Amino acid sequence: MRRFDAAALFTAMDAQRVARGMTWEQVGREIGVSAATIQRARRGGRMEVDGMLAMVGWLGVPVETFVRDSEH
């Protein structure tokens, strides 16, 4: 079975955000979601697939970068 590694996504997003000298509000505007939505998802809250895909797209990497094999 495969799963999406949200923790790895947010680690990568945070590194990119810092490298670009951006706030979470600025990131949210570029992605098209609120900073509160990003923060909620970072804390383990639910997020729509479209939002997650937008976050991956913002990083400019394939979604497979964050897909992991899981046990059971």
Language model segments and positions:
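Residues within the alpha-helical elements of helix-turn-helix
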Residues: 30, 58
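A short, Lys/Arg-rich alpha-helix, primarily the initiator
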Residues: 1-26
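Recognition helix of helix-turn-helix/homeodomain-like DNA-binding domains
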Residues: 32-47
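Short, basic-rich loop-to-helix N-cap that marks the start of a DNA-contacting helix
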Residues: 44-57
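Key DNA-contacting residues within the recognition helix of helix-turn-helix
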Residues: 39-40, 53, 67
